[in-house]
Swiss-Prot record:
Its cofactor is Co(2+); Zn(2+); NAD(+). It catalyses: 7-phospho-2-dehydro-3-deoxy-D-arabino-heptonate = 3-dehydroquinate + phosphate. Its main location: cytoplasm. GO terms for molecular function: 3-dehydroquinate synthase activity; metal ion binding; nucleotide binding. This is 3-dehydroquinate synthase. GO terms for biological process: amino acid biosynthetic process; aromatic amino acid family biosynthetic process; chorismate biosynthetic process. The lineage of its organism: Bacteria, Pseudomonadati, Pseudomonadota, Gammaproteobacteria, Candidatus Pseudothioglobaceae. It comes from Vesicomyosocius okutanii subsp. Calyptogena okutanii (strain HA). InterPro entries: Dehydroquinate_synthase, DHQ_synth_AroB, DHQ_synth_fam, DHQS/DOIS_N, DHQS_C. The keyword Cell membrane does not apply.
Length: 360
């Protein structure tokens, strides 16, 4: 087992990464406050792992909420179902929520934990690659609105993150590839390109799910993320760099309809759009862009949305983004592989060119 610690002062917490962690009750129970525990999961994950978690909680008063599975259910209506379950069971402020599932479950559970009785504890048990390397770490919680992704939410840190890589054994190949988009994103953000080179050299074995490499990949991804979050918890500066490809990607999800593309699939195209704009702005070479595209393709990720989205609708969707300031879209671009920056003075004609290249 590998352990990381996200240093946020009194809000610091461990991230456990390993095999068969769902059999190690002490890892979970030592982070539970009070006697009441609510497990939030979905219809896909519940038959696979709910009983395992329940078996660790026999000394607690526990209940569960089983939600429908999918990004389209990441709404205030679904969140209200969790609130209702907590109130009906008379859970008090000392309770702990457990998010057992992927990013949608984790984001909604965290949002409920941030809001219920003005804040209760919660624990992340991510079961998808995307949630293990990204959404379970860092305290971002929230839901989608019909006009924009993750526009309603809060920062609320978990008490721990428990990553059992055996949950990836039941993850389908499309979901696994979706998680690889966020992994590749870290490769593009990390100085010296050590992680990017690791991914290039091992992409075949990683896609074949070689466990020793998966643990290392998840560990390095989480390490890179916590290094940034520890410096900028509330995304006032450097943490914004973690949104590479996300302004484009969120617009894809919003325009196509949530769930049409998996989040990581949208981010894959978004990363390529950001790198293409970086190339047109004179930062990246065509060879560097080709390297990035090649890695995304080897991870079985989409690289285009041609014929799927109207360019004008796409541009409108880009304006509904948390990074928009005074009506100006702020983008994360690459000066070179391993060095991202926040850009708000890009050439609008070049942005239009990129959107048209990818949409039409």
């Amino acid at each position: 087992m590998k352990i990381l610690n996200l240093d946020l002062g009194y809000k610091s917490y461990p991230i456990y990464i390993g095999q068969n962690l769902l059999l190690k009750g002490e890892l979970l129970t030592k982070h539970i406050s009070g006697k009441q525990v609510m497990i939030v999961t979905n219809t896909t994950v519940a038959p696979l792992y709910l009983k395992k978690v329940q078996n660790l909680l026999l000394s607690f008063e526990f209940a569960q909420v089983i939600l429908p599975d999918g990004e389209k259910y990441k709404t205030l209506d679904t969140v209200n179902c969790i609130f209702s379950a907590l109130l009906e069971k008379r859970f008090d402020r000392s309770c702990t929520l457990i998010a057992l599932g992927g990013g949608v479950v984790g984001d909604m559970t965290g949002f409920v934990a941030a809001s219920y009785q003005r804040g209760v504890n919660f624990i992340q048990i991510p079961t998808t690659l995307l949630s293990q390397v990204d959404s379970s770490v860092g305290g971002k919680t929230g839901v989608n609105h019909m006009l924009g992704k993750n526009m309603i939410g809060a920062f609320h840190q978990p008490k721990c993150v428990l990553i059992d890589i055996y949950t990836l054994d039941t993850l389908d190949s499309q979901q696994y590839s979706s998680g690889m988009a966020e992994v590749i994103k870290y490769g593009l953000l990390v100085e010296y390109l050590n992680f990017f080179n690791f991914l290039q050299e091992n992409i075949k074995d990683l896609m074949d799910r070689k466990q020793s490499l998966i643990i290392e990949m998840i560990y390095q991804s989480c390490q890179h993320k916590i290094n940034i979050v520890a410096q900028d918890e509330l995304e006032m500066g450097k943490r914004t760099l973690l949104n590479l490809g996300h302004t484009f990607g969120h617009a894809i999800e919003n325009t196509l309809g949530y769930g049409t593309f998996l989040h990581g699939e949208a981010i894959s195209v978004g990363i390529l759009m950001a790198t293409r704009l970086s190339q047109l702005e004179g930062y990246l070479s065509s060879k560097q862009v080709a390297k990035i595209q090649d890695l995304l393709e080897k991870a079985n990720l989409p690289i285009s949305i041609i014929g799927k989205i109207n360019a004008s609708a796409f541009m409108k969707a880009m304006l509904v983004d948390k990074k928009v300031i005074n009506g100006n879209i702020r983008l994360i671009l690459l000066k070179r592989l391993g060095q991202a920056f926040i850009c708000d003075n890009y050439n609008n004609h070049l942005l239009d060119q990129v959107v048209n290249e990818f949409c039409q």
